[in-house]
Amino acid sequence: GPGILTRTLLNAGVRVVAVESNLAFLPSLQSLENSLDGQLKVIYGDFFRLDPLVTGKVKPPALCSDELFETMGVAALPWREDVPVKVFGILPQRKERNTLWRLLFALYECSSIYKYGRVELNVFISEKEYKVLTAKPGEVRAYQALSVLWQVGCEIQLLHMEPWSSFITNLKNGALAIPKSVCLPNDHLCLVRLTPRQNLFTGGLKPTNSSTFVFMVKQCFAKPTSRLADRLNSWSLGNGGKLLSEQEIPESAETRNLYPEDYRRLFEALQKSNMFTGTWFHDEVLESIRNIN
């Protein structure tokens, strides 16, 4: 909409492409577009419904990233180059976790918006999801697969925290749109910057095998109190203890004890191991991606 965020960006002098899914906001946005000399471009669509897994033509408000970036005039850059475009938005609360997973799969596969390089996301997310994204081992309720994968993939920076009381969050039926969180604090909306790491695809991690890394981490956190050695043995035919020893990780370590960088090192070691039976992941990885989409 033509609110504070849009006007703040325009007042800063940057070129803005507003992707708006609410038809009620389009007239005022288009009026603002017409009053500016090319600084604002308005597109009807939903940024968080980019590249749905459908056959045939994509129907608005869903969008195709190729068409969006062509309209914006943004060309793809090599991964290690500078950020090609900065995205500002608010994650839909009802689908917040699902949206974070979709973006994560796209990041690791260099698909959708990440085909164009290290696209920077500046997004408002709930405080409880921010706590998950930045959690470390020892934070039992917050530390999850999502924590590991976002921290490996991106630099995460908290830019601002705003109390929910600053926003109108009631649904049409009068209920609160923001449910109370039992396990984690959720009193604020957090503006978070997610910048893909330049060195993400160095070493053994590549877009072609990254979906296996994602699924490996998800499998480890399916039972966070299980011994990592037991998990590894099921993938490397009894070679788990040796791999852990090489990485200086105690054989008694639970899957929730490892830091994000430990998971990356472990995956790269598994890739080098001729005992790794990661091929059995393939069908389950594809099914997981379909479910997320």
What are these regions (language model features)?
Residues E33, P137-V140, C220, W235, ...:
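Alpha-helix boundary/capping residues
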Residues R102, V132, R231, L243, ...:
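Alpha-helical recognition domains of nuclear gene-regulatory proteins
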Residues D187-C190, L194-Q198, G203-E261:
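An accessory alpha-helical subdomain
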Residues P2-L5, S236-N293:
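Peripheral terminal appendages
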Residues G1-F215, G278-T279, S288, I292:
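Catalytic cores of RNA-modifying enzymes
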